[in-house]
């Protein structure tokens, strides 16, 4: 099990990222627009820098939904490889069977 504080911190990052996603993407699209003057683009960069760091989507860590493990998490299931193997072995994941040949 991962520390509860690290799981909670990641959850708050997800919420903050979702709430400020539209604002952040609008600023980025204006910054990369070459038709806007350099001074105005610089002011947009400064306003982007004023947003909280945790509102960036790159700060979010994929964690296992069951254990909170930060590494070895499959995107399709959202579960770490260890728990996924365990659940598949018990037959609890529908549509997935252990291969044998």
Swiss-Prot record:
Residues 11-26 have a biased composition (Basic residues). The keyword RNA-binding applies. This is Small ribosomal subunit protein uS14. The gene is rpsN. Binds 16S rRNA, required for the assembly of 30S particles and may also be responsible for determining the conformation of the 16S rRNA at the A site. Keywords: Ribonucleoprotein, Ribosomal protein, RNA-binding, rRNA-binding. One of its GO terms (cellular component) is cytoplasm. HAMAP family: Ribosomal_uS14_1.
């Amino acid at each position: 099990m991962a520390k509860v504080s690290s799981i909670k911190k990641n959850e708050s990052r997800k919420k903050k990222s979702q709430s400020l996603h539209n604002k952040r993407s609008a600023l980025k699209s204006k910054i990369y627009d070459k038709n806007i003057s350099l001074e105005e683009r610089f002011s947009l960069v400064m306003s982007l820098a004023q947003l909280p760091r945790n509102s960036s989507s790159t700060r979010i860590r994929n964690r296992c939904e069951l254990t909170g493990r930060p590494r070895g998490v499959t995107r399709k299931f959202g579960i770490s490889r260890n728990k996924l193997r365990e659940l598949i072995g018990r037959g609890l994941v529908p549509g997935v069977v252990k291969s044998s040949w």
